[in-house]
Amino acid sequence: MPLPDFHVSEPFTLGIELEMQVVNPPGYDLSQDSSMLIDAVKNEITAGEVKHDITESMLELATDVCRDINQAAGQFSAMQKVVLQAAADHHLEICGGGTHPFQKWQRQEVCENERYQRTLENFGYLIQQATVFGQHVHVGCASGDDAIYLLHGLSRFVPHFIALSAASPYMQGTDTRFASSRPNIFSAFPDNGPMPWVSNWQQFEALFRCLSYTTMIDSIKDLHWDIRPSPHFGTVEVRVMDTPLTLSHAVNMAGLIQATAHWLLTERPFKHQEKDYLLYKFNRFQACRYGLEGVITDPHTGDRRPLTEDTLRLLEKIAPSAHKMGASSAIEALHRQVVSGLNEAQLMRDFVADGGSLIGLVKKHCEIWAGD
C-alpha cells in the first residue's frame, strides 16, 4: 500500500490510546475475552472507541481528537465507566500496567483480524510475546516536515517518557530487575527502536518506499518504532510508555507530551542531526532498567546527567507551553512524582516485598483502576 499524503491536522491536538489488561478473577490471569467485551460496549460508547489489539487479552481504549487533556480525561472517564460495567457483567476485571506479571505467552490467542493474522504469519511467536500493554499519544502537526522535526525532538526525551511511566517490573512470574521491561519484548523485531534518520518528509517517503520492498511493511501500522509519523491522522505518535495504573497518570503523560511538542515546534530549540541518535539505545536502556534513577549521556559532549535531574529541567522548560495547552496540572503532578521519588514500578515491588503475591498484585491493580 503506498504511503498516503500527510493529512494536515490542527497543531497540538491530542489522541490517546491505552492498551488495557482483561483479567479473570479469582486467579487474575489474563482472559481471552476482549471480543466479548467489545461486542457488549460498542453501542454504548458515545465518544472515543473501544477496540481490539493484538491478542484477546488486550482491550484498547482510544479517544477521539481532543483539544486538551481535560477533554481527553472526560472521554476516558466515560469509556471507563461503560467498560467496567460490562466487565463486571461478564465476571471480568480491567487493569493497567505495562506487563501482566505472570501470564504465559503461549496461552495468548491472536485476534481474528486480518492485519494481526498477517503479522502472526510474519513474526510467529513474537506476536504472542507482544501481549504487553502500552500508552500511545498522537500529537497533531500542520505538515509532514513539522512531523519529522517533532519526531526528532521528542526522541531526545524518550528516556524521560519511559522512566516517568515505568510500570512493568514483573514478567512471566519473575522480577526482571527492570523498571520497564515491556520495551524489551520488541527488541527482536527488525524495526525496533528509533526511526532511521531522515531530515524531511520527502526523505521519509523514500524511506517508506524502501521498507515496503521487504513485503513485510504494508502500512505505517506495520512499523514498531518508538515514535512514528502517522500521515493518515496528521500526527506524530509516541509509543514508548507503559500503560499507567490510573487514568489520571495516563492523562498527565499525555499532557507532558503535548506541552513538549508545543515547546519544540514553537521554540525550535534544536538543530537535529543524525549524531543525536548515537547513544539513543544506551540512554533508552538506562530508563528501562533503572527508571528515573538512570543516567543519560549526551552524544555530543559526553556529559552524563541523572535522569531525575534532566527530567526536572525538562518540566521547567515546558511549563509555559503547558500553561498555553491547559496542561499545567499534568506538569505539576509529574514534578511532584519526580521529587518524591515514587513510581509505579517501585510501588509494585513494595507490595510484593510486604508479602503480597503476584495474583494479589493484579487484584490490587484492578482495584486501583476502578477507583481512579
Swiss-Prot record:
Keyword Transcription regulation among UniProt keywords: no
Gene Ontology biological process terms from the UniProt entry: modified amino acid biosynthetic process
Gene3D superfamilies in UniProt: 3.30.590.20
GO MF assignments: ATP binding; glutamate-cysteine ligase activity
Domain of life of the organism encoding this protein: Bacteria
InterPro entries according to UniProt: GCL_type2/YbdK_subfam, GCS2, Gln_synth/guanido_kin_cat_dom, YbdK
EC nos: 6.3.2.2
Keywords, sorted A to Z: ATP-binding, Ligase, Nucleotide-binding
Catalytic activity: L-cysteine + L-glutamate + ATP = gamma-L-glutamyl-L-cysteine + ADP + phosphate + H(+)
Presence of keyword NAD: no
Family: Belongs to the glutamate--cysteine ligase type 2 family. YbdK subfamily.
Quaternary data: Homodimer.
Role description: ATP-dependent carboxylate-amine ligase which exhibits weak glutamate--cysteine ligase activity.
Entries under HAMAP family matching the protein: Glu_cys_ligase_2
The name this protein goes by in its record: Putative glutamate--cysteine ligase 2
